[in-house]
Amino acid sequence: MPKKQDNIVNSLAHTKWNCKYHIVFAPKYRRKIFYEEKRLAIRDILRTICGWKGVEIIEGEVCPDHVHLLLSIPPKMSVSYFVGYLKGKSSLMMFQRFGNMKFAYRNREFWCKGYYVDTVGKNTTAIKEYIANQLE
């Protein structure tokens, strides 16, 4: 992904904004599921869904049992709405792509109910490094 400066201000019709969020969420039962093919699949799915909603992925890492994302979400969209949409759509797409997963996850619930979110502010570089070093 191309590097973007930390202090870039985006704009909408009558708004200037710089909203960045560190978001972490995990599969149901914190299962270690993201290896090889499923790791690549969820990465592509999350990129696709973010693109649909105009959300920029600044940094991201798919760990075996959770996902870290540093996102730039426009202020016209609430964080809770977007995370719900992201988890819901990605869940459906994972079950569609990997049909055998429905036996491991009852009621087709792929993700845990909650998530972690933190506003990033001026320490974007530190959060980017933290996410990039998750697998070390």
List PLM regions with ranges.
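Basic nucleic-acid-binding interfaces
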Residues: 1-136
